[in-house]
């Protein structure tokens, strides 16, 4: 049997030893997932957009995740990656204190917001650390204001 572990770093090594001793293989591609309640991963498995190879991406490097149709692209300062899941699934995996959905198609990392500019008709335009601009749509306007404390 193969499982994927999504637990805190403090528990990961001990759990991995115990499960391996029981004959259970730990694999990032396993169909079953053992997840710690209220624990968010430090690393996501994604595909490199250029080579299509699987890459373990540190969550702290993520600037945005954007949905384009059925594809979800994850942007970092070092490049562009393709998520292995839908945007709503990715949102559930990310820490809500560090990431916020700002439209139906964009999740943004709070730490990478450099400038917040008000726009017409209950919108904000965000300038990110990679100099890209993204819009907070009207549907997410009040959630964003509360989250950012403005």
Question: Predicted regions span which residues?
Answer:
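Basic, polyanion-interacting recognition surfaces, primarily
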Residues: 1-150
